Amino acid sequence: MILVIGDVILDVFKQGPSTRLSPEAPVPVITNLKTRYYPGGAANVAMNTAGLGIQTMIRGVVGADEEGTMLENILHSNHNIVLAISKTYHQPTIVKTRIMANNQQVARIDTEEEFPAITLQEVFNLEGEDFEYIVVSDYNKGNIGNMSNEFKIAREKGIKVLVDPKKEFRNYAGAWLIKPNFKEFCEFLSKPSDFDDMRKIGQAALEKYNIEYMLVTLGEGGMVLISTQGLKQFDAPVCDVYDITGAGDSSLAGLVYGLSKGKTLEESVELAIKAGSVAVTNPATYQLRQGDLRDKIVFTNGVFDIIHAGHIKLLEQAKKLGDRLVVAINSDASVRRLKGDSRPINDEETRAHTLRQFSCVDEVIVFHEDTPYDLIEELKPSIIVKGGDYTKDQVIGSELVDEVVIIPLEQGYSTTNILGKINE
């Protein structure tokens, strides 16, 4: 089990269409508003880790009001979440209401008062609970004060503490890892002139505050991991950004997910980037699911007897559609059944070896059936890619995948034409 502690927020999205401006002010007139509710802040982190299959205790404070009850009910709906939520009559539940016109945010209304700080000590005293990681989600709403003493206890217990900070880093002294964004890095430390300068500034802060790692998020620029050993850059994939709300929470959850699965910190950073990318391509506050972080497998198949420019173009374009490109080729016996005894020209070992030389190809599999249906069912790829001599309804296994992509043929190139010229 992991513990998520911090400022829990109710995110409200009021959305509707707008076709005209108000005559009273230069603002859109929105009609037919629909309202949706999502967990935000530390509650969003918890929903993301729980959505990824991690048993998660969430510790926070809500007001004794309708919004607090609603937030608790949303959290309680996930069976991987254990609630440790307190209620107060002195402050209202923190609510962020976003007004959306045609999917564009035009205003945000925040309802909040500063909460008193909560501590980890009471959680450490819970009998029977053994936390592998503690995730601190600080939105600077009062719940998280200076927790260096608690972090010291956590370290003594062998618990790694990861912090998403919103205050000066001295408040998180003794944490295992802090994850500021670039703006926070510049505000609480100083603005670096280049990556080497960032390394020096970051390492000085790590030493000063007894923190092992600093993971700086750079938006579309990826992430930078700083430790006493140095600095490492991680690139982010190019994606169409729909909504950045809660993306930092999702990336933090992706990081914890990787660590909880026994992956290295660097491998977990890659998952954090992927989680953030998934979040920003979805509307509102997105909650991750386990399938979101698995490799997006692209699948294509064929004989690939005599490799030509058309094959190369298809493979290169297919690779761009996902994380891993798997190429399945017919065995020699399968080719003979389909194309006659004169084929293949190159045996299956030669064809597979040739395909493995292309950097865009991650895996080559030889299948012995007449079609790759059983293999597709086993691999569960997200996308099947075929050449332009197919239509989508002709593609074997199309009902097993999320998407079928047809790539236009490279004119003038085909194995049949090449063999015809040789025979002439």
Feature roles, as predicted:
Residues 236-255, 412:
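Short glycine/threonine-rich catalytic loop with a Thr-x-Gly-x-Asp
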Residues 181, 217, 248-249, 308:
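Short, conserved phosphate/pyrophosphate- and ester-handling motifs at nucleotide-, phospho-/glycolipid
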Residues 10, 251-252, 311:
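Short active-site segment of divalent metal-dependent hydrolases/proteases
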Residues 290-424:
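Nucleotidyltransferase catalytic core that binds NTPs
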